[in-house]
Structures are given as structure tokens and as C-alpha cells.
């Protein structure tokens, strides 16, 4: 087949193999992605500022409008932007306290509270949008990577050692640009659990306020996260896979080695790029907040300013919010994706060989 790459399969077959891997990976890993996004998108609790020794808190009625002060009752105040506030005329003497169930203290706490208060299906919220985005993005990305790597190595434009790094970075940069609007919508669905109708209204408002450019809100930190991630991932993957393949018989499939190599390289890349993932999530979730407070989306803080702000407000720990779910997700998702992709390529290689022999 003239249109086959050096691995013996066509670009279309590469896209089918990678798209299948994307579906399998999304079904298994979406719950961890939902938890990661929810952990990253929540603001630092005001409770820690008002009552450091307890997460149960209230505000003085003197700060409320007179119409609310006159009620003399405990009430829950929600303005749609900040966290819910429990307001009590008796202050600390009141026996009834409000504890915000949407505040998460960790990964397991997030899993338990999401299931308890929102239902198990919430763990797969945004899955349709995830599949709509992930399948074409992964098909484009993996196919572009293999084609670029073959191109770079075939024309000796770079050494075989660094070809995976360059090819991975270029492939991811193009994919991020094409898929960025869908990534924004998926993050919005997972972080605030809005309906598709509400999401559409939110997007229309953002476009009306800031133009079509607002749909690429978060492109900068997404690129800063994904391009280095891709470069690090493929560089380490090819190295680890090459090393592991030295321990297997020549007639043994390399899918198992790909699984291990993918998990290791994905973990390393995820740790090093996590701060940019936090910034990307907060910037994209801010789309709804901009609508609520009527902020012009064109005037957004730079990635570096957001990094400094997060560190000032939450410390270095804030830059690694969602660390555990991201790492827990990165290792198996990268392992599942690359091993499924390699299995698909092996399947098509055998299929093409059988066709040649049969023809």
C-alpha cells in the first residue's frame, strides 16, 4: 500500500486505532477527570479565614440589608458566584450550622460527596462532550505524531533520540488549537454540572461579550500544559519502551511493554505540568463567573500572573491542586491509551499482511 507509513499501516488505520483507544480510555477515566476538575475549580474556603479551627461558620447580620436582618432567622445566602453563606443572628451561639457539602478536602472526599449529593451519574458528567472532543483530537494527535516522527527520521531533520519530542510537541500544538473550544465546554460541564441548554446560553453570552476569541479562553495555559506534556511523554515513552523491549523475546507482542512505558512516562509528564493544568481549569471555569459579574472576557490575566496569584492565595500546594487524581488518572489513562493504540496498529499490520499474502 503506497499510502502506508513505515509501520505498515495507513493514516486512516492509525486514526481508527487511536480513536478506539480514546473511547476505551474515556469510559474508564472520566470519573477521575471530573474529580480533578472539581478540586481545581473550587475557590479557597472563606471558612478557613473566618474560623480557622472549624469549617462551620456564619456571618454577622449587621453586614446584611435591613430587609434580611429583620427576619431574625437563620438563612442560607447564595448569589451564584461565591460559596453559599450560612447567616445566623445569634452568631456562634446558634446550634444550627451549615457545612457546605460541595467543599472537597481531598480525592476520596470528593468522590463520596459527589455521589452522595449529586448521584453516581455525575461522575460521568460531560462524557458525551468528552467523547466528541477526545475521539477526533486523539485521532488527529496520534496520527500526526506518527507521521511527523517518520518524516523527521526519514529526512534526518533531527536525531532519532529527539524526533519523538519534536513530533509530539508539534502534533499537540496543532491539536490544542483545533480542540480548545470543545475542551472549554467539557470543563464547564464537569466543574459546574450545568445542562447542555445552560452551557449553550453561557457560550452565546461569552461570544456576545468577547467575540469568537472567547471560545479559546484557556488556550495559553492549555498549550503550556499539553505541549511540554506531549514532548516529555513521547521522549520518555520511546526511551522506556526501547529499554523494556530488550527484555522480551522477539516474537512476543510489545503491547504489555507499551502499557508499562505509557504509565511511567505519563506520570512523569503529568507531575511536571500540573500547575499549568490548574491555571487552565480555573480560567475556563471563570467563563460563567464573567457572565455573572459582567466582566469583559477580553481582559484576562496572563498565565504567569495567575500562577503567582494562586501561589499567593493558596501557597505552592495550590499550584498542585488535584495532584492525586491527576496522577492516578495519568498513569492508567496513558497506559490504556497507548497500549490500545499499539494493539490496534498490530491488528491492522497483521490484517494488511494477510491481504498481501492472500492477494
Swiss-Prot record:
Q: In which tissues is it expressed?
A: Expressed in many tissues. Abundant in testis and kidney.
Topology check: give the Mitochondrial matrix ranges. Answer: 36-121, 182-214, 280-317
Q: Where are the transmembrane segments?
A: 15-35, 122-142, 161-181, 215-235, 259-279, 318-338
Which residues make up the binding site for [2Fe-2S] cluster? Answer: 74, 78, 88, 94
> Which topology term describes how it sits in the membrane?
Multi-pass membrane protein
One Pfam family name is Mito_carr
Molecular function GO terms recorded: 2 iron, 2 sulfur cluster binding; glutathione transmembrane transporter activity; metal ion binding
Kindly list the places in or outside the cell where this protein is found, as annotated in its UniProt entry. Mitochondrion inner membrane
Record has Transport as a keyword: yes
Activity regulation comment:
The activity of SLC25A39 is regulated by levels of mitochondrial glutathione via its ability to bind [2Fe-2S] iron-sulfur cluster. Upon physiological levels of mitochondrial glutathione, glutathione prevents iron-sulfur-binding to SLC25A39 promoting cleavage and degradation by AFG3L2. Upon depletion of mitochondrial glutathione, SLC25A39 binds iron-sulfur, preventing cleavage and degradation by AFG3L2.
> What would be one Gene Ontology cellular-component term for the protein?
mitochondrion
One GO term under biological process is: cellular response to iron ion
Keyword Magnesium among record annotations: no
Q: Tell me the protein family, please.
A: Belongs to the mitochondrial carrier (TC 2.A.29) family.
Q: What does this protein do?
A: Mitochondrial transporter required for glutathione import into mitochondria. Glutathione, which plays key roles in oxidative metabolism, is produced exclusively in the cytosol and is imported in many organelles. Mitochondrial glutathione is required for the activity and stability of proteins containing iron-sulfur clusters, as well as erythropoiesis.
What is this protein identified as? Mitochondrial glutathione transporter SLC25A39
Biological source species: Homo sapiens (Human)
Q: What is the lineage of its organism?
A: Eukaryota, Metazoa, Chordata, Craniata, Vertebrata
Amino acid at each position: 500500500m503506497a499510502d502506508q507509513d513505515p509501520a505498515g499501516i495507513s493514516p486512516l488505520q492509525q486514526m481508527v486505532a487511536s480513536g478506539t483507544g480514546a473511547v476505551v480510555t474515556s469510559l474508564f477515566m472520566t470519573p477521575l477527570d471530573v474529580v480533578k476538575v472539581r478540586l481545581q475549580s473550587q475557590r479557597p474556603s472563606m471558612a478557613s479565614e473566618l474560623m480557622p479551627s472549624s469549617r462551620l461558620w456564619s456571618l454577622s447580620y449587621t453586614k446584611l440589608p435591613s430587609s434580611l436582618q429583620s427576619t431574625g432567622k437563620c438563612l442560607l445566602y447564595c448569589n451564584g458566584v461565591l460559596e453559599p453563606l450560612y447567616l445566623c443572628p445569634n452568631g456562634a451561639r446558634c446550634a444550627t450550622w451549615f457545612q457546605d457539602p460541595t467543599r472537597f478536602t481531598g480525592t476520596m472526599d470528593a468522590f463520596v460527596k459527589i455521589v452522595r449529593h449529586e448521584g453516581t451519574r455525575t461522575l460521568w458528567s460531560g462524557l458525551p462532550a468528552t467523547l466528541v472532543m477526545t475521539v477526533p483530537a486523539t485521532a488527529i494527535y496520534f496520527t500526526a505524531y506518527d507521521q511527523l516522527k517518520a518524516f523527521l527520521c526519514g529526512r534526518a531533520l533531527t536525531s532519532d533520540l529527539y524526533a519523538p519530542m519534536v513530533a509530539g510537541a508539534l502534533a499537540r500544538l496543532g491539536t490544542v488549537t483545533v480542540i480548545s473550544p470543545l475542551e472549554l465546554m467539557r470543563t464547564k460541564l464537569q466543574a459546574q454540572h450545568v445542562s447542555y441548554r445552560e452551557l449553550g446560553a453561557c457560550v452565546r453570552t461569552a461570544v456576545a461579550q468577547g467575540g469568537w476569541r472567547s471560545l479559546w479562553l484557556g488556550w495559553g495555559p492549555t498549550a503550556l500544559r499539553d505541549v511540554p506534556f506531549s514532548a516529555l511523554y513521547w521522549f520518555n515513552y520511546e526511551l522506556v519502551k526501547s529499554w523494556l523491549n530488550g527484555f522480551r523475546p522477539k516474537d512476543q507482542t510489545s503491547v504489555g511493554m507499551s502499557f508499562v512505558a505509557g504509565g511511567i512516562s505519563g506520570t512523569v509528564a503529568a507531575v511536571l505540568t500540573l500547575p499549568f493544568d490548574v491555571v487552565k481549569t480555573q480560567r475556563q471555569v471563570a467563563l460563567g463567573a464573567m457572565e455573572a459579574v459582567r466582566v469583559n472576557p477580553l481582559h484576562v490575566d496572563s498565565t504567569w500572573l495567575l500562577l503567582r496569584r494562586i501561589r499567593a492565595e493558596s501557597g505552592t500546594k495550590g499550584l498542585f491542586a488535584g495532584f492525586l487524581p491527576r496522577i492516578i488518572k495519568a498513569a492508567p489513562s496513558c497506559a490504556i491509551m497507548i497500549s490500545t493504540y499499539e494493539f490496534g496498529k498490530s491488528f491492522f499490520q497483521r490484517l494488511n499482511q494477510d491481504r498481501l499474502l492472500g492477494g
